Amino acid sequence: MTETKPIRILGVGNVLCTDDGLGPYAIKVLEAQFEFPEQVEVLDLGTPGLDFTPYLADTRMVIVLDTVKGEEAAGTLRLLRDGEIVAKPPPSRMSPHEPGLREALMATEFSDSNPEEILLIGVVPESTGQGTKLTEAVRSAVPSVVAAVMAELERLGCVPVRRDPPAELDLWWE
């Protein structure tokens, strides 16, 4: 019997830096609203840096939730797939957690353990200064982040069950 590779949803960010806490916040929303199939792992990684690699290795799909640099208005949703993430020139940082995702993906490719698919669901931040709450622009984008995650899981045939009623949102840092 072959083992099914996991699908991982990874929230990345620093909850003490306003909008940079998007990833952990979105993970808490997902956990409160849905029960996930066994092969789907939902994890708040905080700011993993190069420790990202083990979470990417040998997976069917990795969905990363994070803030991303962009010229668009704060709160704009950006989706980057597979090669788009490593295609950026090295000096251009896509998130405040680099070195991190880009370098970790390159490491998994080198060791031939890279994820079959990866999707970065990012939101352009308004502020990454000190603070424990998301700005209104980024908080308003969270339902779109959740919808993008659900669309990917549905495409993969791993549909979570909606909690009725949802669990209480555990935002321990607010």
Residue ranges and their predicted role:
Residues 11-16, 90-93, 130-133:
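A short glycine/serine-rich beta->alpha loop
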Residues 21, 25, 47, 72, ...:
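Conserved active-site and cofactor/substrate-binding residues in soluble primary-metabolism enzymes
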Residues 3-10, 15-87:
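Nucleotide and nucleotide-moiety/phosphate-recognizing core
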Residues 89, 101-174:
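Phosphate-binding/catalytic loops
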Residues 1-2, 174:
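General N-terminal leader/first-domain-start detector
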